[in-house]
Amino acid sequence: MKKQIAILGSTGSIGTQALQVIEEHPDLYEVYALTANNRVDLLVEQARKFMPEAVVIANEEKYLQLKEALSDLPVKVYAGADALSQIVESQPIDIVLASMVGYAGLRPTINAIKAGKAIALANKETLVVAGELINALANQYHTPVLPVDSEHSAIFQCLEINNRLEKVILTASGGPFRTYTMEQLQTVTKAQALKHPNWEMGAKITIDSASMMNKGFEVIEAKWLFGMRPEQIEVVVHPQSVIHSMVQFEDGAVKAQLGMPDMRLPIQYAFSYPERVKSSFERLDFARITDLTFEQPDTKRFRNLALAYEALYRAGNMPCIVNAANEVVVDAFLKDKISFLGMSDVIEQTMGKVAYIKEPTYEDYVDTDAEARRVALSLLSS
């Protein structure tokens, strides 16, 4: 029986690579639903190739265009946030790949968990914003949440039953500005920030990687995926991106997962878990690896990592505040409305201006997200 897969964000970097995995294993996987935010042309192309049961476009203004383009196919067409959240509940679906960008992925992921679907989680913001809620729901509905982030997939693959962890070690490439001085960071452009040295990703996550907010979010994500305390989660800069992450056990032994910097590998493992499936992806050639280096991250130059740790220690709705402010400032940076270093200033100020809630409900997260965005936008315009 083929696994039926719904891909939330099929036109993005993770979504398109997931379709490559499915295409390589047509005997194992079948696309049930594809969703996108705005990119109608690519969604149509994907629908014609993979023939899903349904497609959803989040932007309701694009519905008629999508409907017309697929009028000759027996594919159901839906639009809007409600449709996006409802499609994941469809009975045939086995796995939901949550690869939408940002806060928008929270509600459909919650609905998928409640519907008992296995979650292949690429949308780290879902756990950043509401990790405690997601974990509680996953336990309540007995729903597996499998990491797709390369670092968390690496940790997941290194874990051993009944062997207690001392800490997890997340590796970071350091991004394009790893060796830049503070003076150089003051004048970097979005064009420079969008050139990641090792990974091909979408614009938002590429900027997050350059600012190290992406690594900060992964620290928060690791807390909820693996039940770690903040002080048990270490970040080490590893420019070669060959070691994807490590775990250290109480006896001092360390296990690492190595591989090419190719997101199709963790995507495929999330789809096939607990089995491993043969792939044609490029193999690691140790004879060509000249060095593997490590260094401590500089949180003075890359303050976002320190802000993420602070949010994790404070807990409650603080990570939600950081995520919302970050989405606002990254959008502003991509529109040349704020400097690279200025992003951290706005995030930190937003953390101090939005009301703190120690034990937030889902409604509190919704309100916090809206208020943090309002505050961050007002700081940008002041």
UniProtKB/Swiss-Prot annotation:
Pfam families: DXP_redisom_C, DXP_reductoisom, DXPR_C. Disulfide bonds: none annotated. Pathway: Isoprenoid biosynthesis; isopentenyl diphosphate biosynthesis via DXP pathway; isopentenyl diphosphate from 1-deoxy-D-xylulose 5-phosphate: step 1/6. Keywords: Isoprene biosynthesis, Manganese, Metal-binding, NADP, Oxidoreductase. It catalyses: 2-C-methyl-D-erythritol 4-phosphate + NADP(+) = 1-deoxy-D-xylulose 5-phosphate + NADPH + H(+). It is an enzyme of class 1 (oxidoreductase). NCBIfam families: Dxr, PRK12464.1. This is 1-deoxy-D-xylulose 5-phosphate reductoisomerase. It comes from Phocaeicola vulgatus (strain ATCC 8482 / DSM 1447 / JCM 5826 / CCUG 4940 / NBRC 14291 / NCTC 11154). The lineage of its organism: Bacteria, Pseudomonadati, Bacteroidota, Bacteroidia, Bacteroidales. The gene is dxr.
